[in-house]
Amino acid sequence: MDLIQIIVLAIVQGLTEFLPVSSSAHLILFPHLVGWDDQGLAFDVAVHLGTLAAVVWYFRQEVFGMTRDWFASLARRERVGDSRLAWAVILGTIPAGIAGLLFKGFIEEQMRSPLVIAWATIGFGLLLWWSDVVSRRTPQPRDEHSLSWKDILLIGCAQALALIPGTSRSGVTMTAGLLLGLSRSGAARFSFLLSIPIIVLASGLSTLDLVEGEVAVDWTAMGLGVVLSAISAYLCIHFFLKLLERVGMLPFVIYRLILGAVLLVLFSGV
């Protein structure tokens, strides 16, 4: 990988991991447009570690409080502070974890085509638009602390759909949150907290594959990938949460429709 490819792909991954757009669509589109080779598993691990560092650092107070209160709740066998939110993140992760174990092979073999990604980008983009319309009509939107266990499980099941390339994990979890009556910022915050265990699990599995495959590692590329994806992801989270209530989801929906259409034109000759 040359320096330009490292910079572009790391920044793209950092931005698209948390925006309600599809990271897989971008990682297919950019190499196709400029003729780059596949970035490789080691670089994928690096940029995921960068985005993980960004979201953990941004929500460091929440993560610390949830972790502390979760252990305290286990010791006291009662709810303590933010322990319920910690349990919510754990419960919301389970459906995606199960789906990943059951369908990982099928999805990698059958659903990673550019056309699947294009249609998923468009279809789930329209669902995001609909959920935002529903949210605007909700008289008293809730925050992430008010979710019932049923709500959490439904958002977790929605997150499992993100295994379909082109869906966008953040997009589909925000969609579910908005449809369940969360405010835009509440849906986004819970989506970002849910990303932490998912990124940990995905990075762990990829690291195992990397070790077992004895793949040569470009440590300079990995280091740059971690740093650049972390910076871009942190800035993305900050400005997205700052502007979300004002601009809503429509700009991202329009972008997804354009992106999906471009992929269709490039890969099917539409």
From Swiss-Prot:
One of its GO terms (cellular component) is plasma membrane. It is a multi-pass membrane protein. One of its GO terms (molecular function) is undecaprenyl-diphosphatase activity. It is an enzyme of class 3 (hydrolase). Its main location: membrane. It comes from the Bacteria. Its EC number is 3.6.1.27. The chain crosses the membrane at residues 1-21, 39-59, 87-107, 114-134, 147-167, 190-210, 221-241, 247-267. It is found in: Cell inner membrane. The keyword rRNA-binding does not apply. Keywords: Antibiotic resistance, Cell inner membrane, Cell membrane, Cell shape, Cell wall biogenesis/degradation, Hydrolase, Membrane, Peptidoglycan synthesis, Transmembrane, Transmembrane helix. It catalyses: di-trans,octa-cis-undecaprenyl diphosphate + H2O = di-trans,octa-cis-undecaprenyl phosphate + phosphate + H(+). InterPro entries: UppP (IPR003824). GO terms for biological process: cell wall organization; peptidoglycan biosynthetic process; regulation of cell shape; response to antibiotic. It holds the Pfam family BacA. Catalyzes the dephosphorylation of undecaprenyl diphosphate (UPP). Confers resistance to bacitracin. NCBIfam families: PRK00281.2-4 (NF001393), undec_PP_bacA (TIGR00753). Belongs to the UppP family. Bacitracin is thought to be involved in the inhibition of peptidoglycan synthesis by sequestering undecaprenyl diphosphate, thereby reducing the pool of lipid carrier available. This is Undecaprenyl-diphosphatase 2. It comes from Stutzerimonas stutzeri (strain A1501) (Pseudomonas stutzeri).
